[in-house]
């Protein structure tokens, strides 16, 4: 990002913004995240000039958090500026739900980006006005949290967002440069007085720490930005190494423990982070990651340990690591009537049963469906899978099928009266399976959305 601006001088102009944007994206539909502050106002103003010379579509999106008594005034200001510049304007209001210990900044940011993600259309680029100053602040915040190279990468210049993408074209421009542009063009922007409140960590860095660093090291913003770029490159290499390791140790969505144990502890931690990240879960802290290694990965081979953090559970079973949302409470006692004709929502987070008529597979359609019920394992059930000569306990069969212990009571069982006739996803019992030209109900579990 910094290299792109070398040789261009420090004065911000729409022409230099054009060079950024065309380097970062080939899209021609843009949506500006417009707060009304000086940074986003400069971006709106410069983009309006570029749109007069290029066949681009441009709109502005304002988020009204309602946290400040002046919030409605800021929204009106943004509306007026966009009307003057003939830019389509949209405002969205959010109500923040704060829990004890929540950071207002973090909750507001999450709500804001949820709206951005939903609002973007296909091939549309969201432009935000984050500057080199913002990048330095983010880097220092992550540093003081003990972040690794991924966190120290701070904000990427470009990433996917919803159906479109997010681009930050001002990451190598300082606020001072934007202020010069704003004053030269007689722009009027809003001032958020909460940006002066030192109780917020970012504000403390902005007003107390960085000015001291800048007096000693005038190029501190550019230097920190360069370090963030180095960290981003290192993080990419670590991700590539993890992907290479996952090719060898991941089967379906589980990790094979033996090949994982052959890696160095550093690569084990790297793989675990990537595995958890790719499943869309919150990454563990360093201490939690070490607990996962010690308590789950390195547990006795016949143990079935579980490690829980946030809303996540990591378990070990039959030489594999499993990752899932924390299991909800499950009542295994209900009998649910079902005639196969409609989908059947299962209790809790177990998903939905669906049945499709097919020839030669599934449960015979000639059965009396008025006697069909769906149940769950209580213990002591017996089953003779179709094609096998002997009856076995369901417990033994589930061990044979290598169903993890914590999932066994959650597998739907289909009964005809008091007779077990199918274990959904695993077998039809002898005498109840459709063969040849016979029609059958092919039953599957549809995971919860």
UniProtKB/Swiss-Prot annotation:
Location relative to the cell: Cytoplasm
Domain text: The N-terminal region contains the highly conserved SGGXDS motif, predicted to be a P-loop motif involved in ATP binding.
InterPro entries: Lysidine-tRNA-synth_C, Rossmann-like_a/b/a_fold, TilS/TtcA_N, tRNA_Ile_lys_synt, tRNA_Ile_lys_synt_N, tRNA_Ile_lys_synt_subst-bd
Catalysed reaction, written as an equation: cytidine(34) in tRNA(Ile2) + L-lysine + ATP = lysidine(34) in tRNA(Ile2) + AMP + diphosphate + H(+)
Xref: Pfam families: ATP_bind_3, TilS, TilS_C
A GO term from the CC aspect: cytoplasm
Keyword annotations: ATP-binding, Cytoplasm, Ligase, Nucleotide-binding, tRNA processing
The keyword Cytoplasm belongs to this UniProt entry's keyword annotation: yes
UniProt organism field: Coxiella burnetii (strain RSA 493 / Nine Mile phase I)
Entry EC number(s): 6.3.4.19
Record's signal peptide: none
Family statement: Belongs to the tRNA(Ile)-lysidine synthase family.
Chain positions recorded as ATP binding sites: 35-40
Protein name per its UniProtKB record: tRNA(Ile)-lysidine synthase
Swiss-Prot/TrEMBL GO biological process terms: tRNA modification
GO molecular function: ATP binding; tRNA(Ile)-lysidine synthase activity
Primary location class: cytoplasm
